[in-house]
């Protein structure tokens, strides 16, 4: 019979074994940060974009890891656990959106950003593509990135702090500072190369975790019969069309529209060594995404049977993965699985920090110092980039210090904000010669405004009619497309160089 002292001793030993795995994981990230510092931080393009020298496999997994964040490991399983298989519509929409993104956006963006003044940020590309001499478009799009990504980043820090709090019973603020320190370290010193390599490493960890947990859970339950048990508990658990209205399904599916305008994802396409490597990246990236998301769905479904079988009181569905990893695995393996959650969180934070830093440096500081200074004072601009990483992180930490801050309610809508304001603009910029600066600015701003208005005033009316509960990216995207097209048609046409560049981009992309 175990005494209280013996049980406590075993718990402490288990925690220390888990801590060892987390410490090893952190150490690897620090080493990668040093490697990135030595290899590719000599100029701003190297620091912010890896010198456009990234291979297809790192591109694929870094895009996936920075995209999924802690949502794939905690949010999606929790949603499936709560609502059943109908929550899978978001995975279908995201996978389809990412797949189309590789075909429609990736090749042209890689070629066009280099052709258009070797742009290293999305606002810089918009400026060069539309000959925005007044920098209005660059400043507005840069501000959108800085504001929304600072909020996005703070949500990642909150997730990191809460992970240490819920998994180990440690102080929330200690976990917050620890996660922030590691991410800031390798991003500050190693730049884009370090972020991409760590994302690759973290993507591998995430994939292993999402395959391992549901398989072991089924082995400890009823094998493949676990899904029969889940259906027996509630028939709608395994029905893709039950539990959600048509509006709900369309809303989840429409998340895929956001991919074309997410700066931290499409910057991966800009950094790949050649557009000819993108098919390899696409095959690996979409395979990784499909397996990872299916694994997350499987975690949620097996969790429906797992929780009552092990007599667990699950207060927060989003902690399902944490609970399963602690109950089913040895503490060392459990530490690895908790590292997978950290990997998901930190890969997104680092990508968002770097994109925000690059916008502050390239889109704002360069305006103050001038183009010539940027060419002749590369070391200065790299240092400004590093300091921008630090500054954004400090602001995000300050916001995250109070995890109950109402700003948290806004962060979940950032995907829609970027999707509605940037996705149509990116597509028009890559394909339509008639796009004008006025059309671009009007479309971008109108898309963002519709998202904000929909969230603030329309969605609260969902109890009157479910159409008002439609995901805000849909009306925002539609309005942005219409406004961009109409205003462009009514304003002065761009110069002949645009058609020449578009044709050149098209021809280069078609080269085998």
Curated annotation (Swiss-Prot):
Pfam families according to UniProt: SSF
Record has Coiled coil as a keyword: no
Disulfide bonds: none
GO BP: proline transport
Example of a GO cellular component annotation carried by this entry: plasma membrane
Chief place of localization: membrane
Superkingdom in the source lineage: Bacteria
Reactions mediated catalytically: L-proline(in) + Na(+)(in) = L-proline(out) + Na(+)(out)
Gene3D superfamilies, per database record: Sodium/glucose cotransporter
Keyword Transmembrane among record annotations: yes
Membrane topology reported for the UniProt record: Multi-pass membrane protein
Keywords tagged on the record: Amino-acid transport, Cell membrane, Ion transport, Membrane, Sodium, Sodium transport, Symport, Transmembrane, Transmembrane helix, Transport
Function: Catalyzes the sodium-dependent uptake of extracellular L-proline. Since most S.aureus strains are L-proline auxotrophs, this transporter may aid the bacterial persistence during an infection of tissues with low proline concentrations.
Family: Belongs to the sodium:solute symporter (SSF) (TC 2.A.21) family.
Name listed for the protein in its UniProt record: Sodium/proline symporter
Taxonomic lineage of the native organism: Bacteria, Bacillati, Bacillota, Bacilli, Bacillales
